[in-house]
UniProtKB/Swiss-Prot annotation:
Superkingdom as given in the UniProt entry: Eukaryota
Lineage: Eukaryota, Fungi, Dikarya, Ascomycota, Pezizomycotina
Needed cofactors: Fe cation
UniProt name for this protein: Fumigatonoid B endoperoxide isomerase nvfE
Pfam families reported in the protein's UniProt record: PhyH
Catalytic activity: fumigatonoid B = fumigatonoid C
Phenotypic consequence of gene deletion: Completely abolishes the production of novofumigatonin, but accumulates fumigatonoid B and asnovolin A.
Annotated residues for binding of Fe cation: 152, 154, 234
InterPro entries in the record: Phytyl_CoA_dOase-like
Source organism per UniProt: Aspergillus novofumigatus (strain IBT 16806)
Length: 327
């Protein structure tokens, strides 16, 4: 084995091989549950939390989403069939208030993604803390016989880049997700696969093969959740079932200082922006950042202010035309 191969292997070593799995119904206090989730994610980058939401909540969220499913499609470049439903806050009040607003999720995301900064102002050292912001909401309906995704990290859209680390420190991650199972989510019908401990890996190294023995699967019942840091190597898997769609609602949050100083989207109304030349619309923020950051309903935001505008970009086209081999 050559030196580069040895280095690669070491940079993808992990001290954890199993899935941290907690049952929220067995914890006597919320703070104890939160502490154990944080401990698990610090070690493995992920944590499965059972029974975080009730069956009645899951049923209501599914009912709220259902009228929107037939008119929705998948992200461009995404394999298989089904749909990605976005903008979930306006589609389900119970999702907005009870899922996004869940206090366990709030405490976990605040731990990993709150940013504290100190600066001299007027002769005084001031301290500022910025809690995370909502990044996106996506409910994935993946139908039977749909292929899975390629392995990836979710922080690629924010250009996350880390070296290998022997232990986790807060500040390493840009974002995190909570996936709520709205149906059974299993290896057979396309649940998420991931590498425990991959949040500590070297980003300059390619991903292992999809049949690597270290891969684990987040198998969930309705109401269970899968928490994941954006530095974790993961993907959806093939839905090999014949009659079992897999439905997961993802709530993604990111560090809130990753935004413009002046809120361009409320400062100028869409009609005014529609009169701007294309270059100015893009400068204001009405354009996606590659690979695909800043979309509206899975499309270039210029389509909102000008329905005749062609999409400038989709994720699949970007990956096909900008391939690079890292040495």
């Amino acid at each position: 084995m050559g030196r580069d191969q040895v280095s690669h292997k070491r940079s993808q070593n992990s001290n954890v091989s199993e899935i941290p799995d907690l049952d929220s119904s067995l914890h006597r206090s919320e703070d104890t549950l939160v502490a154990e989730i944080i401990e698990a994610m610090t070690l493995a980058g992920v944590c499965v939390v059972r029974n975080l939401f009730t069956k009645s909540l899951v049923d209501q969220v599914l009912k709220d989403f259902e009228p929107h499913v037939s008119s929705t499609k998948l992200f461009d470049g995404y394999p298989g069939n089904g749909c990605h439903l976005t903008g979930l806050l306006s589609k389900s009040e119970i999702y907005a208030h009870m899922v996004v607003g869940n206090s366990v999720f709030e405490k976990v995301r605040n731990h990993f993604l709150s940013t504290t900064f100190r600066s001299w102002i007027g002769g005084k050292m001031m301290t500022f803390t910025s809690p995370p912001q909502l990044d996106s909401t996506i409910c994935s309906y993946i139908n039977p016989q749909s292929p899975g995704e390629h392995l990836h990290r979710d922080d690629a859209i924010h250009y996350g880049w880390n070296e290998a680390a022997s232990e986790y420190t807060v500040g390493r991650d840009i974002s995190m997700s909570m996936f709520l199972a709205l149906t059974e989510s299993t290896r057979e019908n396309g649940t998420t696969r991931f590498f425990p401990g991959s949040h500590l890996w070297d980003y300059s190294q390619d991903f292992p093969s999809a049949d690597d023995t270290r891969i684990r699967y987040a198998e969930l019942h309705p109401g269970d959740c899968y928490f994941m840091l954006s530095s974790v190597t993961h993907s959806s898997t093939d839905n090999r079932s014949t009659n079992r769609p897999r439905v997961l609602a993802a709530t993604i949050v990111t560090r809130s200082h990753l935004r413009q100083e002046e809120n361009q989207y409320l400062t100028y109304d869409p009609i005014t922006v529609g009169r701007f030349p294309t270059w100015l619309q893009r400068l204001v923020g009405y354009a996606p950042s590659a690979p695909f950051l800043g979309w509206v309903d899975k499309r270039d935001p210029r389509c909102v202010i000008d329905p005749k505008a062609a999409d400038d970009h989709c994720g699949g086209e970007y990956y096909e035309t900008n391939e690079e081999t890292l040495n």
